[in-house]
Amino acid sequence: MPNMKVHIQFPEDKIKEPVIYQIGHEYKVVTNVRRADVRVTTGWMDLELTGDSTEIERAIVGLRKKGVIVDPIELNVVE
């Protein structure tokens, strides 16, 4: 099954929202947090999304619509 690794950054107003939970329920993707650093005012996460390629792309668009910055991780650097 296809997967994609992304680096996401949360602005302060999104830190307390269950964004990853929501994405896992709104789209047919499995989320796997590989690394993270979440503080009171900001946070980042390396996230692996697994599922159909179309659903992965929809989930990324959904994250961006929620105000989260999403960048692809090149060369599987979280391994």
Which residues are covered by each model-predicted region?
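Long, contiguous binding/interaction regions
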Residues: M1-E79
